Regions:
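Single-stranded RNA-binding regions, centering on S1/OB-family and related RNA-binding modules
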Residues: 1-216
């Protein structure tokens, strides 16, 4: 299945002066501009490309690697603001929009924010949001105590730190379980400490902490 906002392996089906067209399956053919076409590329070859919407809102392919893909979170910097919202540098020619209704608080140019990137099906565009709890599940039923996970620090609370689990869920690291100050956006390995009665997840950030807690 071909998905927008991620890397896809697509086959070259047509050559033109300004690039090549790729078979996008149900998305029709997709242009890979000439400057991104690998040397020696021919009809029938397969290429790894990232799909996004250009400044004319046309679906286009690139071999450039963005800083984040759809379905993931990352710290990005605001480079512009206009009537539509804030625009962030994500490593591609067209900046990434954070609409005003997806901003937890007003964003400012030059500041970096942790955002979740998604494909807005209603507007058919790639967008980002600082309202992480609107997009990430806080009560995943398939996480179990002592399960290894990848964490990204999302923010501070009175109890400790909110953390993103595997780019999909939200959990909590209690301050007592954080053996050092943690930075928003920081990525680190962790473990599920416990699943609360309400289904929310408590986390640990090191094997040593987990072992010490178990020994107690």
């Amino acid at each position: 299945m071909v998905t927008v906002g991620t890397f896809n392996q697509l086959q070259v089906v047509k050559e033109v002066d300004f690039g090549v067209y790729l078979d996008g399956d149900d998305l029709d053919t997709i242009l890979l501009p000439k400057r991104y076409v690998p040397e020696g590329c021919e009809i029938g070859d397969w290429v790894s490309v990232f799909l996004y919407f250009d400044s004319d809102d046309l679906l286009i392919a690139t071999t450039e690697t963005p800083k984040v893909e759809v379905g993931s979170c990352e710290m990005l910097t605001v480079v512009d603001i206009n009537h539509a919202g804030a625009f962030m540098d994500w490593g591609l020619p067209k900046d990434l929009l954070v609409p005003y209704n997806e901003q937890q608080k007003p964003m400012e140019v030059g500041y970096s924010y942790l955002v979740y990137v998604f494909h807005d099906q209603q507007s058919d565009r790639i967008a980002a949001s600082t309202k992480l709890s609107h997009h990430l599940d806080e009560t995943p039923v398939w996480l179990k105590p002592r399960q290894a996970v990848n964490l990204q620090i999302a923010g501070r609370t009175d109890l400790g730190y909110k953390a993103i689990i595997d780019d999909k869920y939200l959990g909590l690291i209690f301050r007592a379980d954080a053996y050092r100050p943690l930075k928003i956006g920081e990525r680190l390995p962790g473990f599920v400490k416990a699943v609360r009665d309400d289904g929310k997840i408590d986390l640990l950030i090191s094997q040593a902490t987990l072992q010490g807690d178990h020994d107690l």
